[in-house]
Amino acid sequence: GGIRILPPFITSGTRGGEKLYTTRLEALVGVKNFVENCGADHIIISDCNMICNIDFNDALDNHIANDADITIITKLVNTNELKFPLDKYIKVVNYNGNGEIVDYASYDRQNGELHINTNMMIVKRSYLLDLINESEARGYDSFSRDVIRRNLGKHRFFAYEYDGYFNYIDSMQKYFFCNMKMLDSSKRKLVFHVKNRPVYTKVRNSAPTRYTSDAKVTNSI
């Protein structure tokens, strides 16, 4: 168990020899050796540009109860309430009453409430190994196109709805916006003050900022 941070571009043994990956699926092919030997029954795959405080235990229980091959963690958003429009690379997920995914497509400027892929997912390790081997054999490179869309209705793909605070950073403007959001105590509590889910940050014992008599500071943490 636990978190394993794998160095990027470990692609030895992938098709074509040493190469730099450009997609999620190519990156997974590059860490095939780790997947083979990690010993876990299920693996959580996540991007690193999301802001949220999530307990994966409930999502994992849901994944196991559904006997899912892949469980995609989704978030319900209302496009009419967003400060920034959704990126075209965001995936929209539709699922039935049992949580089974029935449609998966790129965002196409739809308005209203949408279930979007948070780019966090739980995958059965044996299934992931089969995906990696098939991708190597057939030259697949897109997780969305070659795995999810190709196998919808054939394999067990489920959604798990995350209902906590969520945002993602895909630009400098969004980075600034998300930081400014943390000045709002109600938003800050949703990230840093969730019961039994503390956020541990790195201690930086550096010299404090010096404020002179003519400094003007407002709305600062």
Regions found by a protein language model. Name each.
Residues 1-51, 56-58:
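Conserved N-terminal catalytic core of the sugar/cofactor nucleotidyltransferase
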Residues 6-8, 73, 104, 160-162:
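Conserved beta-strand termini and adjacent loop/short-helix elements that scaffold enzyme active sites
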Residues 21-22, 53, 121-122, 142, ...:
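Short aromatic/basic micro-patch
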Residues 30-34, 62, 76, 150:
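A generic secondary-structure signal
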Residues 53-126:
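Conserved core of the sugar-phosphate nucleotidyltransferase
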Residues 126, 134-221:
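Left-handed beta-helix
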